[in-house]
C-alpha cells in the first residue's frame, strides 16, 4: 500500500488524505442535491399557473425570485467561509433550503411561491461560492500533486448536473405520484437532510479566525487578472441567461406551443439541456478555455435555431434536439468562464471572488427571462 502511494503521488496515502477525498465526494453530492432542489419547480410551473391563475409573466417573476435570494446570499454571506470555515456556512444554507421546501409546500399562494423561491436562492447563493472553494480545498489536501482543474470541473458538473436532475425528479414524481405540488418537496427535504449529514462528516479546511484579527479582503484578484475575470463573468452571465430562459419558460412553451400535457415531459427539455451541458464539460473539459468559448458559442447559436424551428413547425423532437445542442454550448461557456475565474482569485479571498463571479452568473439567470416575459406580454 505504501509502495503504491509512493509510485503514484496522486493516490491518497494517509488516513487524512483519504478522509479529505471522501469529503470531496460527499460535499459534491450535497451540492448536487441543493442545485437539484433549485430547479425542482421547473415542470411544476404549469400546475402553479393553473392553480393560482398565473400569467407567464408572473410565473417568470416567481422563477426569478430565486435570483434575488441568490444575489443576497452571495453578497452578504458568500465570502464568510474564508473566515468562519466552509462547513459552518454550508450546513446552515442546507437548513435554509429545507425551510424553503416547507414554505413552498405549506403556503399555497403566490406570495408563498415568492418567499420559497427567495429562500431557495439564499441557500444556493451561500453554497455556490463556498462549495466551489471547499471542493478545491478538499481535493488539494487529498491529492496535492494532482491538477487543480479537476475540482473546478467537478464543481461545474455538480452545479449544472444538479440543476438538470431537479426537473427530471420532480417531473417524474408529479407525473406518477399523488399530490404533485407536495411530494417532490417531501423527497427533497429528506435529501437535503442527508446532505447536511454528508457535510458534517467531511473535514473542515479553514481554521476559524476571529473577526478582530487582520482579515483578507472580500474581493481581490491576482495581479493582471482583472480583465480576464470581467470577461469570464460576462460569459457566465450569458450562459446562465440561456439556462434561465429554458428553466422559466420551457415548461409553459412545451405545454402551450407543443400541446404536451404530461408534467414529466414538461421538465424533459430542461433536463436534456442541463444534463448535456454537464456531459459536454466531461467530454471536452480538457480543451483550453478559448476553444471551449468558441465551440460553446457556435453550439448555443445552432441549438436555439433548432428550437425556433421546432416551435414554428411544432415538433417535440426538434425542441429536445435544440435543447441538447444549446445545452452543450451553454455548459462549455460556463466551464470556460469558471476555468478562468478560479485561478484569477487571490488565494486569501477565493470565496469572495467566486461569490462575485456567481453573482453575475445568477443575475444572468433571472434578468433575461423576466425581460423576455415582459416584452412578450407587451407585444401580445
Regions found by a protein language model. Name each.
Residues 53, 85, 106-111, 178, ...:
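Helix-breaking motifs and short loop linkers at transmembrane-helix boundaries and internal kinks
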Residues 71-111:
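Conserved MFS/SLC helix-loop-helix module at the cytosolic interface between two early adjacent transmembrane helices
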Residues 111-123, 317-325:
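Paired small-residue
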Residues 116-157:
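Cytoplasmic helix-loop-helix junction between adjacent transmembrane helices
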Residues 146, 153-200:
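Helix-loop-helix hairpin linking two adjacent transmembrane segments in secondary transporters
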Residues 265-289, 299, 303:
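Transmembrane alpha-helices of Major Facilitator/SLC transporters
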Residues 291-337:
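C-terminal transmembrane helical hairpin of 12-TM major facilitator-type secondary transporters
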Residues 338-379:
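A late C-terminal transmembrane helix in Major Facilitator Superfamily
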Amino acid at each position: 500500500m505504501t509502495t503504491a502511494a509512493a509510485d503514484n503521488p496522486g493516490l491518497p496515502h494517509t488516513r487524512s488524505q483519504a478522509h479529505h477525498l471522501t469529503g470531496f465526494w460527499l460535499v459534491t453530492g450535497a451540492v448536487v442535491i441543493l442545485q437539484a432542489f433549485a430547479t425542482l419547480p421547473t415542470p411544476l410551473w404549469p400546475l402553479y399557473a393553473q392553480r393560482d391563475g398565473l400569467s407567464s409573466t408572473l410565473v417568470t417573476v416567481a422563477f426569478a425570485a430565486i435570483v434575488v435570494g441568490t444575489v443576497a446570499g452571495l453578497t452578504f454571506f458568500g465570502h464568510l467561509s474564508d473566515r468562519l470555515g466552509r462547513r459552518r456556512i454550508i450546513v446552515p444554507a442546507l437548513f435554509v433550503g429545507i425551510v424553503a421546501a416547507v414554505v413552498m409546500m405549506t403556503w399555497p399562494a403566490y406570495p408563498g411561491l415568492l418567499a420559497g423561491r427567495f429562500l431557495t436562492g439564499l441557500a444556493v447563493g451561500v453554497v455556490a461560492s463556498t462549495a466551489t472553494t471547499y471542493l478545491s480545498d478538499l481535493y488539494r489536501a487529498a491529492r496535492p500533486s494532482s491538477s487543480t482543474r479537476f475540482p473546478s470541473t467537478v464543481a461545474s458538473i455538480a452545479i449544472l448536473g444538479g440543476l438538470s436532475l431537479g426537473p427530471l425528479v420532480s417531473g417524474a414524481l408529479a407525473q406518477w405520484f399523488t399530490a404533485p405540488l407536495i411530494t417532490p418537496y417531501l423527497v427533497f427535504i429528506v435529501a437535503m437532510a442527508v446532505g447536511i449529514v454528508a457535510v458534517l462528516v467531511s473535514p473542515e479546511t479553514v481554521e476559524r479566525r476571529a473577526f478582530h484579527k487582520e482579515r483578507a479582503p472580500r474581493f481581490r484578484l491576482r495581479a493582471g487578472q482583472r480583465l480576464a475575470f470581467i470577461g469570464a463573468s460576462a460569459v457566465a452571465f450569458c450562459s446562465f441567461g440561456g439556462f434561465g430562459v429554458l428553466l422559466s419558460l420551457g415548461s409553459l412553451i412545451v405545454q402551450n406551443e407543443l400541446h404536451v400535457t404530461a408534467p414529466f415531459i414538461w421538465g424533459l427539455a430542461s433536463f436534456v439541456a442541463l444534463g448535456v451541458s454537464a456531459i459536454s464539460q466531461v467530454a471536452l473539459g480538457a480543451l483550453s478555455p478559448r476553444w471551449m468559448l468558441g465551440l460553446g458559442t457556435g453550439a448555443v447559436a445552432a441549438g436555439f435555431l433548432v428550437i425556433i424551428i421546432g416551435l414554428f413547425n411544432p415538433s417535440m423532437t426538434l425542441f429536445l434536439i435544440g435543447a441538447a445542442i444549446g445545452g452543450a454550448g451553454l455548459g462549455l461557456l460556463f466551464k470556460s468562464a469558471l476555468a478562468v475565474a478560479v485561478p484569477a482569485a487571490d488565494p486569501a479571498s477565493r470565496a469572495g471572488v467566486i461569490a462575485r463571479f456567481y453573482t453575475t452568473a445568477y443575475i444572468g439567470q433571472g434578468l433575461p427571462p423576466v425581460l423576455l416575459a415582459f416584452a412578450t406580454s407587451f407585444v401580445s
